[in-house]
Amino acid sequence: MKRIAIAIDRVDWHARRLHAAFLALDMAPRFVSLRTVAFTPEGLRFPGLEGLPDAVFVRAIAAGSFEEVTRRLGILHALAARGVAVWNSARAIERCVDKSMTAFLLAAAGIPTPETWTVEGREAAAAVVLQAATELVLKPLFGAQGRGLQRIRVPEDLPPPEAVAGVYHLQRFVPPAGEDGFCDYRLLMCRGEMVAAMARRSAEWVTNLHRGARPAAFAPTPEMMALAARAAAAVGADYAGVDLIGAADGRILVLEVNSMPGWRGLQSVAEGSIAAILARRLVA
């Protein structure tokens, strides 16, 4: 019986469904907080576990100091070095948590994405705003769930450095392609295949479910599925939430790639259990 560690600090809706999905596969799942895993002279020590798990599903990494987060990512690196399957790998998580690296890798792979700049200091950011000569979106470099987004039209709109930890991550704003309000798309990808998809519609420009957007069933085109698969591969993710948006010129652009995506909204419009699909593919 394979032992599966579900890495999470607070057991949430997703973790409970993953646990049930692994049980249904006759696996032995357990919740593990990475903060409790230790580096020892003998190697990694998991509390209450003899040896190492057979696989690790990283549902979330808790916030902490730079040193704490670095150590937790180090645990994932060490597990992979010992041959343990880790979803997602520390490398993929590092690439996706840092939005500037995600944007760089997408562009390097030739994947269409809104023009993006990441600079330090308000003066450098102001120069970007003037150079772009169009509306931009300021995003936290480390951020999720639509928090902290701000539209920037002129340099005076830029917040002070202390409000953004000194880093300005600016992406060209993509206006609505149609007349039905704001809409983008989330595709959940796993090993190059789509697991589920939804459209997110909102009267506001931030189309995040945590900000009031509404999920809707959606059948993506082959082009969209191929683009999402390429985006997940570009960051090295085994599974990922890929956000797409339609531009006014008809192009489909990749906005972001999430290496620890939630799927509660997706599950509300999807057929079958998403957790069951992910669990089955991890242990395949």
Pin down the residues of each PLM region.
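Rossmann-like NAD(P)H-binding beta-loop-alpha module
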Residues: A109-A133
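Glycine-rich phosphate/pyrophosphate-binding beta-alpha loops
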Residues: N258-A270
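Protein kinase-like catalytic core scaffold
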Residues: L136, V195-A196, A240, L253-E256
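A long amphipathic alpha-helix within ATP-dependent nucleotide-binding catalytic cores
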Residues: W205-V254, G265, A276-A284
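Phosphate-binding site of ATP-dependent enzymes
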Residues: Q145-A232
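Conserved N-proximal alpha/beta basic substrate-recognition cap immediately N-terminal to
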Residues: D9-E115
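Short acidic-glycine loop/turn motifs at beta-strand connectors
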Residues: D26, M189-E193, A247-G250
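Extreme N-terminal starter segment of soluble prokaryotic enzymes
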Residues: M1-A5
